[in-house]
């Protein structure tokens, strides 16, 4: 039987009909990769380099810079940001959401609070480009807090834990990812040598083995004002690391990138300049040259197929573009979809014990976390012009004085930190028009307010690390199903007291920067006591947890190499592995962890298939 040839076999499990369905079984491959975003593309490249035959299954359509990023259609705000062209189709599958276990969850039917991607490149095609590493403290968060503040400092019901891997172990993979992405930035120290003082480096950054591939992007006027104000109140501003190129670049795989022109259309759009790193631009061109690699679009994976004892995966079952069930046998299964899709597939497939919040037992679905973000906007008079239509998704200036544990949390009684930044990514004419509080939503007064504020404002964020709690988790919904007849994933989530107290503290500190700019008005603020998670307002798409990594199979779904404790030929890279949220954006950490996992597969697992860590 040749590659791609089909035979009909009976397959049990969820289906669109009742009972047993008939599926087409393809020839076995060495590895099947589920989801082709950053994690999937990295894994596919690494495993293909190792000599494996790799098939990547992407549920969405084929996407690329052309035609999806072709100018001028690619800067159509109505199509992309308002009508959400590149995002997940919620009419086929979504999640249900409730604030606590006493409520009945209802489906998330309109894209708003978070925006999962679909299609080639996943969210990596239309992300902003903010490309951080991680603060080392956040990798051993529980043990660090217990050592510095005592075990009783961590609130009851907070389930934070250590990642099980250190910054020094991951540093080569952060470096590798930056060279693939073409990241622009300013280093602080390289191999212990100071190079970034008064040159845009981050005073709080951990040591690096080499410099950024490209210098930091130029600072917008907003970023300059923020940096001056931050310095004036004693903080340490630095250039944000950006996967938007500051100059021409050829990456590790031979992919060529052009310099960013600050067009302001990054988040929600495909970059027409080949300036923003994406799986489509930075990895796929090299994979296309590999005869051992195949990407199949419109391939919706229904489940991972397991042996009768559920100790080994035999491949996956998916629906192709014609709606036919297809079985793709494989020796190795990589779940590299979006965070909650990884968790959903594990629950549907019976990989790992589902989390039970009542007993606090089980692992799949536990420690779901988000991003605790707060925003302030400074409005100036007409003598200060900020040109907010200019922008690059990852460019900006940040301060880390209150990130991670860079300050003494003891007097304040909350866990977690937050960077502050001005990240001018391009304020759009439909969705990005700030007006003072009390302005009507339409009419002559609204028009006058827009004219008065649009070109004279700055927006800044406190990008708070969100902690994990026993009360916030993922499981299968008992009431709602997707179009394929499978239970939807249920998200039980709400802000906790720690989140609100942290947000209020951070906004107070960030407000000092804002006031130092001498604006005529400041709008925005922190969550107040009793604030509930609002699904109707965009916050971030930085979801994490649910299939977390760790050193104990009783409290983690995957080991330190992202290998399933229960099914050792299944690996699950992605933000689903984070035991709690980070202060920084997750993409850099996802990329480094995926390279780390891929190396373990190549150098250890393929030589001796089986558990890489003994339970």
Curated annotation (Swiss-Prot):
Subcellular location: Cell membrane
Keyword Lipoprotein annotated: no
InterPro entries according to UniProt: FAD/NAD-bd_sf (IPR036188), GMC_OxRdtase_N (IPR000172), GMC_OxRtase_C (IPR007867)
Residues at the active site: 542 (proton acceptor)
Membrane topology field: Peripheral membrane protein
The protein's required cofactors: FAD
Biophysicochemical property: pH dependence: Optimum pH is 5.0.
Biophysicochemical property: temperature dependence: Optimum temperature is 30 degrees Celsius.
Catalysis: reaction(s): D-gluconate + A = 2-dehydro-D-gluconate + AH2
GO cellular component: plasma membrane
Oxidoreductase among keywords: yes
The EC number(s) this enzyme carries: 1.1.99.3
First-tier enzyme category under EC: oxidoreductase
Gene3D superfamilies: FAD/NAD(P)-binding domain
Quaternary structure and partners: Heterotrimer.
Family of this protein: Belongs to the GMC oxidoreductase family.
Described purpose of this protein according to its UniProt entry: Part of the heterotrimer that catalyzes the conversion of D-gluconate to 2-dehydro-D-gluconate. This subunit functions as the dehydrogenase.
Name under which the protein is recorded: Gluconate 2-dehydrogenase flavoprotein
The species this protein was found in: Pantoea cypripedii
